[in-house]
Design a protein with these regions (language model features):
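Active-site neighborhood of phospho(di)ester-bond hydrolases with catalytic His/Asp-centered motifs
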Residues: 50-52, 74-82, 102-105, 163-166, ...
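Metallo-beta-lactamase
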Residues: 6-10, 103-152, 205-211
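Terminal amphipathic helices with adjacent charged low-complexity linkers/tails
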Residues: 228-254
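FMN-binding flavodoxin-like domain, especially the glycine-rich phosphate-binding loop
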Residues: 4, 175, 186-224, 229-230, ...
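Active-site-proximal loop/helix segment associated with metal-binding centers of metalloenzymes
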Residues: 148-152, 168-203, 245-251
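Active-site metal-binding motif and surrounding structural segment of the metallo-beta-lactamase
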Residues: 45, 56-103
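Conserved beta-strand hairpin/beta-sheet module of binuclear metal-dependent hydrolase folds
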Residues: 5-66, 154-157, 161-165, 266
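Short acidic active-site motifs
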Residues: 89, 293-298
């Protein structure tokens, strides 16, 4: 009986690892519940490992691999994706299995050499749509460039209908005992982390993600084995729909209010705007302090909610620096399905509202015509304008369009 690996099908085993040490994925995105690095081994007449793990957890992966191989050789390692959380364990694997061949595509060649000193003549290269017969296993490879690196690809094993999807359909969070979608409370523990993973890591490449989904749409998929998060065997249509909605940036009726405040006056502005939203009957309101909330969660809420209101104080005749950082990140996301509102504050020289206008106009975003700019603590007229901005946003969200400027 296998103690550490987990058998998936007659020939397929899970040998992935959990990382509860790394605090931020890509040193940017918080991991409050850790992350899993999924790796798989097909044990047949030729033994095939599908994706390695991060080097910090490779020994645990090898322990599981040895348990499955029972002294047999490892013949092939498939490199679906070169990001080091999936490839940095390769050198250790090659030290243990020096006769093993790597399978990758042309775009991975320079990366493998620059990261690990592996030369092109040591590789088996596969084209888009090419099928390889590796002993008694047949795999077809599909290139999925920029989902989310240029060399990214997936493979499909037709006999069992298994798609090895690399980062596509991935999610943050460790796998704590159970590894399948129907063995975990997905909506409770993983849905939010799947959304945040997509938005933070893949979102800016949504056009390419939709192309990849289209390319894979004709396959008879019975199971999806991603490189992060649970294995999908019982709700294939559900996860494909979740991913399609994310790639299309399907928004929900709600408003994310993000403020940058130093001494509390701008925060008070945000509270008045929220009051206006609520007075129009919109209940789905999220408010964040841009200086305290990690960018990961700010981007996720901006992607999710139809209405976004940015409120910033001025700082050295410009945007409050954390707000400036957020707007720069938002530019990369290329979000076009939102309705935007902006407001600014200043003490002697402005800059905040100017910076926010440059952002929404430069990105050609749908923005509300009312753009309050408040000096100091504000006046009664300012307070009225802020409440009206909230009301205007709530109406725009419910109607799905920006009102005409009066």
């Amino acid at each position: 009986m296998k103690q550490f690996s987990q058998q998936i099908t007659d020939k397929l085993y899970y040998i992935g690892t959990n990382d509860r040490i790394t605090e931020q994925f890509e040193n940017m995105w918080p991991l409050p519940d850790g992350v899993a690095y999924n790796s798989y081994i097909i044990k047949g007449s030729k033994n095939i490992l599908l994706d390695s793990v991060k080097s910090t957890t490779i020994e645990e992966c090898i322990r599981k691999l040895d348990e499955v191989l029972e002294g047999e050789e490892l013949h092939y390692i498939i490199v679906h994706h070169m990001e080091p959380d999936h490839s940095s364990g390769i050198p250790t694997l090659l030290l243990k299995y020096p006769n093993c061949k790597l399978i990758a595509n042309k775009r991975a060649v320079k990366m493998l050499e620059s990261y690990y000193g592996i030369k092109e003549d040591e590789l088996i290269l596969v084209d888009d749509g090419e099928t390889l017969e590796l002993g008694d296993t047949k795999l077809t490879f599909y290139h999925t460039p920029m989902v989310h690196w240029p060399e990214s690809m997936v493979s499909f094993e037709e006999e069992t209908g298994t798609l090895f999807s690399q980062d596509i359909f991935g999610a943050f969070g460790t796998l704590d005992g159970a590894i399948y979608d129907d063995e975990v409370e997905f909506d409770r523990y993983y849905l939010e982390e799947m959304s945040r993973y997509y938005i933070n890591i893949v979102g800016k490449y949504s056009g390419q993600a939709l192309k990849a989904l289209g390319k894979l749409g004709g396959l008879d998929i019975k199971m999806i084995c991603p490189d992060h998060g649970p294995i999908w065997r019982n709700n294939i249509e559900k996860v494909i729909q979740i991913y399609t909605d994310l790639a299309n940036q399907k928004t929900e009726d709600g408003v994310a209010i993000i403020f940058g405040s130093i001494y509390g006056n701008t925060e008070r502005m945000a509270q008045l705007i929220a009051k206006g939203v609520a007075e129009e009957g919109l209940t789905n309101i999220r408010m964040h302090d841009v200086a305290k909330t990690p960018q990961s969660y700010l981007l996720a809420d901006c992607w999710r909610y139809k209405g976004i209101i940015l409120i910033s104080c001025s700082y050295d005749k410009a945007l409050f620096p954390p707000m400036a950082f957020l707007t720069n990140e938002l530019k990369h996301q290329k979000m076009k399905n939102n309705i935007w509102g902006i407001a600014g504050s200043y003490s002697w020289n402005g800059g905040a509202i100017k910076g926010l206008k440059e952002f929404v106009e430069g990105e050609k975003l749908n923005v509300l015509p009312l753009m309050p700019e408040v000096m100091g603590a504000g006046s009664e007229k300012d307070f009225e304008d802020l409440i009206n901005l909230g009301k205007m946003m709530a109406k725009a969200v419910k109607e799905g369009k920006v009102p005409e400027a009066e």
